[in-house]
Design a protein with these regions (language model features):
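PIN-domain endoribonuclease scaffold, especially VapC-family toxins
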Residues: 2-3, 13-100, 114-124
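C-terminal structural segments of small proteins and small subunits
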Residues: 100-112
Length: 125
């Protein structure tokens, strides 16, 4: 594994089944939520199909004790820097997963990680 893919990359990819890298279980949670809250039936069908491809392609990295510890460290850093970590809970779980795995986080949303950009290795796709 060379990188962890953020949810934004999974959503933005034309063919998510061709992406290379790993994903966090937190990304699957975000994708499942996205399927369940959309009201338009056509969009729900598109999201469900994309989620199926992603689940068939990737074996997500878990949020285990090591990731929980790293999440705490990153959340504390955000709080110390004047941010609100609870608003970014899923992003922090994904960043913590990347840090524990020792790989960069590939994201379209670098601004989401601005307060901890010195603590997480970020890349754009």
């Amino acid at each position: 594994m060379r990188a962890l893919l953020d949810t934004s990359v999974l959503i933005g990819a034309e063919s998510p089944g061709t992406l290379e890298g790993a994903i966090s279980a937190a990304s699957l949670a975000e994708l499942h939520f996205g399927v369940l809250v959309v009201l338009d039936p056509d969009e729900r069908a598109r999201r469900t199909q994309r989620l199926g491809v992603i689940e068939a392609t990737f074996d997500p990295l878990p949020i285990d004790a090591a990731v929980a510890r790293e999440w705490g460290r990153l959340a504390a850093a955000i709080a110390d820097r004047g941010g609100q970590p609870r608003r970014r809970a899923m992003d922090l779980a994904i960043a913590a997963t990347a840090n524990v795995a020792g790989v960069p986080l590939v994201t379209h949303d670098e601004a989401d990680f601005r307060l901890i950009e010195d603590l997480v290795q970020l890349r754009t796709p």
